[in-house]
Regions:
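Active-site-adjacent structural elements that line small-molecule/cofactor binding pockets in enzymes
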Residues: 1-143
Length: 143
């Protein structure tokens, strides 16, 4: 939020009046290890792209970005996907039970996110998409 506040100030605006959008990569599951494996398989190649790799580094994960870059260059899939510790995945992704993912989106809102875009992790079957969106239906979720 620090960057948003600085940018708003430079533009002569109050950061609290700006819509702050976050695309949340969500996977609803009771098996967090399976969810983390899904995250690794989809986001290691994504963050191997130089543009997104630099973004990951800018976001405060320089060691992860370097490991992905080096693993990708070596064509070592295990090294590339293994660059993400569980802790990093839990910071970047939103993985867990219905209650856990709802709580995380509420935490983000309390931190200043005004609009959360709920996105399934990767290309998913329709039933998994419904499972992802279900906890955020209007009759099941409020801030």
């Amino acid at each position: 939020m620090e960057h948003v506040k600085v940018g708003a100030e430079r533009a002569g605006k109050d950061w609290r009046d700006i819509e702050i959008v976050n695309r949340a990569m969500v996977h609803v599951t009771d098996n967090k290890e399976e969810g983390r494996a899904l995250f690794r398989s989809h986001f290691a190649p994504y963050f191997s792209n130089p543009v997104y790799n630099r973004f990951l580094e800018w976001c405060g994960y320089p060691d992860v970005a370097a490991e992905i870059r080096e693993g990708w260059a070596a064509r070592d899939r295990e090294r590339t996907t293994g660059a993400f510790s569980n802790e990093v995945i839990d910071e970047i992704g939103v993985i867990g039970s219905t209650t856990e993912v709802q709580a995380r989106i509420r935490e983000d809102a309390n931190a200043g996110i005004t609009t959360s875009i709920i996105s399934p992790i990767g290309r998913v079957e329709l039933d998994v998409a419904y499972q992802t969106f279900e906890p955020f239906r209007g009759d099941r979720f409020e801030l």
